[in-house]
Amino acid sequence: MRKTILAITAAIMFSANAMAQGDVYERSKIYEWPTDKQVVEKLHQWQDLKFGVLFHWGLYAVPGIVESWSICDEDWITRDTTMTYQQYKDWYWGQADKFNPTEFNPEQWASVMSDAGMKYMIFTTKHHDGFCMFDSKYTDFSIAHHAFKDNPRRDVLKYVNEAFRKKNFMIGTYFSKPDWHSQDYWWDVYPTKRGRNVNYDVKKWPWRWNAYKEFTYNQMNEILSRYGKVDILWMDGGWVCKENNQDIDMPHIAEMARRNQPGIIMVDRTIHGPYENYQTPERTIPETQLNYRWESCIPLTNDWGYVKHPTWKSPEKVINTLIEIVAKGGNLVLGVGPTPQGTIQPEAVERLNAIGKWLKKNGRAIYNTTTTKNYHSGNVWFTASKDHKHLYGIYMLTEGEKLPESITWQGNLPKKGAKIKILANGKSIKPTINGNNVTVKLPAGLPQQSVAFEI
């Protein structure tokens, strides 16, 4: 059995990783501006933060496979033929009795992310597999009722939120609208041949769907009423929607959410309308500036959660991604997957520290900035202070290349006689202006990474 499971795990890791690259959420094509003044104000505050973290942590961390998807009966998943689909699901559910993160240290998480320059945090309270990372009254399928049940920190969400609040983070909760463990979503009476979707006819069995709606409402009420101030409700599983005959009654959820948390930002991913207060392009950056609120969600590796042999993005890759996103008017939430023991991998800490060091010196061109009409010229990207008294340029150094002796851009001309200030060292440089072109000679000794300056 052990050999079979290992073989299955390897196969699923391969195919699911391929899926993770290809089948990603497309952002909505329509944006509806919120009218609630508290929501509008919260969105302004959130947009100023620019850089956040999204934690995926759950049962999938134990075998180190792509989050939840291996139990979904869709064509892109391949499994070892010696185990039936039901046997595999039973094995997967059984990881709950192995998930015992005795090294769980949310204070370490918060310190690492704060040092990385992140300003807000989103934590997976429940992914599509239905395993809750909080002590829910409505199911025993949670970390608080299995291998970790005797740990004083078994109500994981409580301690994650508290640790990040102490570091002055804006707090977000990820919640999956589909729950593949629930009998009211995947009913054992029927096979799961409808893939990720509810596996029975909602119109034929309305009482069961109503039970699922009530269950979902109650769990969202728990995470929004028992765990302190929450700023963002980040809802995943866009196929659970009215248009797909899976009406979860979002107006009812929204009324409860904003009663519990006035001004909360709601992110009903990919479902345009009043409950998608910002859009979430996944693993991608929009081609141009967008004139509404958005956030690219991109993992630090190729996977959202912990895997045993990750492919890491370099600090330079993340920094350059952040630069482009901010210049285009968005935020970046970076995916990090804690280990099954409850720690952040040293390789992640190393990269996050490097990102934080860059932001400590250059963050003035990132945080609390707004966009400029001329936001991009060659390798130079532009932002501005919110009062438009200061214009910033950032030369994006391509990975593997060395800083040039001088850089040139078009437009965004300095005022006559003004000098350009390098943010990393405070040195001022006199620019050369030729028509619409600006050239500056970079001082020696700069680190071989992207350079921010005030124009």
What is each PLM-predicted segment?
Residues M1-D23:
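Bacterial Sec-dependent N-terminal signal peptides
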Residues Q21-I455:
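Mature catalytic domains of secreted/periplasmic carbohydrate-active enzymes
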